[in-house]
């Protein structure tokens, strides 16, 4: 269990999720995902 802290409604740490492109011409689709905190809890 990692300790998480809130900042401006977002939670840290966050991890980068990368999805391979659907075509060879595309770039890797990378986006940040908030890893720890869940909305609506506590």
From Swiss-Prot:
PROSITE patterns: MYOTOXINS_1, MYOTOXINS_2. Monomer. It holds the Pfam family Myotoxins. It comes from the Eukaryota. Changing residue 25 to F: In fraction 5 and in 10% of fraction 2. One of its GO terms (molecular function) is potassium channel regulator activity. Coiled coil: none annotated. Gene3D superfamilies: Anthopleurin-A (2.20.20.10). GO terms for biological process: envenomation resulting in occlusion of the pore of voltage-gated potassium channel in another organism. GO terms for cellular component: extracellular region. Expressed by the venom gland. SUPFAM superfamilies: Defensin-like (SSF57392). Belongs to the crotamine-myotoxin family. This is Myotoxin-A.
């Amino acid at each position: 269990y990692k300790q998480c802290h809130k900042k401006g409604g977002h939670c840290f740490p966050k991890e980068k999720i990368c999805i391979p492109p659907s075509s060879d011409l595309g770039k890797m689709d990378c986006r940040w995902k908030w890893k720890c905190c869940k909305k609506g809890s506590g």
